[in-house]
């Protein structure tokens, strides 16, 4: 958890990794987008997952605009789309589409987690120049 002060690159990457873990744990029983609306408990899962997607997007945005960006090496990840999703969640929450959230969780987070893990183990991220 954030305890104040300036976040380092590693702090931001760790927040992304933690968020991916939480989302994957919370959404284990979600098998389709409609499951998010099946009960109040599932709506809470949806809201929690979306909040963590927002955290991921916020941290990606902070890392994306660093010069040089530690993310620039991994062009296979749609970094700007991740940041754009954060903006949608933050500014147009009622327009968040359950299907897009479901697809993101089930199809995209695994690859993102692999890249974030690689970034955490690179000396550039660890050095935090």
Please annotate each region the language model reported.
Residues 11-46:
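N-terminal first-folded block
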Residues 1-14:
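Extreme N-terminal tail/first-helix region
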Residues 15-18, 22, 55, 81, ...:
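Charged, amphipathic alpha-helical oligomerization/scaffolding segments
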Residues 121-129:
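Conserved small/polar residues in nucleotide/adenosyl-binding loops
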Residues 65-81:
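Short, mixed-charge amphipathic alpha-helical segments
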Residues 94-102, 107:
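C-terminal structural segments of small proteins and small subunits
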Residues 79-96:
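Histidine-centered, metal-coordinating catalytic motifs and their short helical/loop contexts
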Residues 52-63:
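Short, contiguous, well-structured surface segments enriched in hydrophobic/aromatic residues
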